[in-house]
Amino acid sequence: MIHDLVIVGSGPAGYTASIYAARAQLSPIVLAGSVSAGGALMNTTEVENYPGFVEGVLGPELMTRMQEQAERFGADIRYEDVTALDLDGEIKRVTTDDGVYETRTVIISTGSEYRKLGIDGEERLSGHGVSYCATC
């Protein structure tokens, strides 16, 4: 079966893409990952600069709301890890541990990764003076 759209990643960009795609009468599949679903905001406490949340919102709560909205419009969220991509040709192939998805369109929204400096004490001080921020 050739799917309308496969979205790799389930952070704000992935869920936003799935909401707009579903509202456009496509049937998006979101490959959220088996461990890292929700993106970097799942590891964030207070998000104070997201529009519409005057008092702020916790990162995991924001991501849960985005997922619920995506599902409400018809996005199919699957907790699978992508192991390979074949983006050559008209039909793209996205391989997970559970199978292969064929689609004409792939959106890769794998987000960000903290960039560590590799300096002495960085790991030991993580969360105690050294921090990484998903929304800064």
What annotation goes with each model-predicted range?
Residues 1-8, 24, 29, 36, ...:
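FAD-binding core/adjacent interface of flavoenzyme oxidoreductases
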Residues 3-73:
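Beta1-alpha1 glycine-rich phosphate/pyrophosphate-binding loop at the start
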